[in-house]
Amino acid sequence: LLSSVVLSGSAILFAGTEEQKQTLLPQIVSGEKRIALACDEGFHHQPTAISATAAKEGDTFLLNGSKARVIDGLSADLFIVAVRTAGNAGDTNGISLLLLDASTPGISIEKTSLVDSRNYARLTFNNVCIPASHLLGEMHNGFAALDKALDRGRICLAAEMFGGIQEIFDRTVQYLKERKQFGVLIGTFQALQHRT
């Protein structure tokens, strides 16, 4: 949840209008709304490889395509979807960020079978209509905000992993101080001392 809040919240912070920031950021921070960033289409380490499209038609966008692995996608109320509005996959220009309510008709949300606790989902979009007012930042220029948000997300993910490892280490040390084998604390065994 933390990395999802940081990723999505950062995208809103970097690209959102003042109204979007004032409305959404307090809801995200308070936990009132759960939000997820949807940009991965299977090229996990290349965020410019976006091929999901959003064609502007009047005052709406028509969204089609899919997202392969969306962290916290199963529990999200709202998505920030990175889409191609111009150019070709691989270009940094032509990427836009759109806010999408999870209950919008035409969106399919499926659980993915990854061994992780992050509620990964696969999203499929079939002619999903999104109001033009749900554009984050400027049309075709969403990559700069996306890139900054991903940088913050990487730092957050590293902090989460470090915290988890520290907890495992602390519990292991505690166990070594409490568990006895052959009438002796196992923490006194030389082989286990080498590992801690």
Where in the sequence are the language-model features?
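Buried hydrophobic positions in well-ordered alpha/beta secondary-structure cores of metabolic enzymes
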Residues: 17, 37, 63-65, 81, ...
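Short Gly/Pro-enriched turn/cap motifs at secondary-structure boundaries
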Residues: 42-45, 69-72, 88-89, 112-119
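Glycine-rich beta->alpha junctions and the first turn(s) of the following alpha-helix
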Residues: 107-195
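Internal helix-loop-helix
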Residues: 1-31, 71-78
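A short, Trp-centered hydrophobic/proline-enriched beta-strand micro-motif
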Residues: 31-42
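A short core secondary-structure module
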Residues: 64-108
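A structural signal for short hydrophobic beta-strand segments in well-ordered beta-sheet cores
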Residues: 52-55
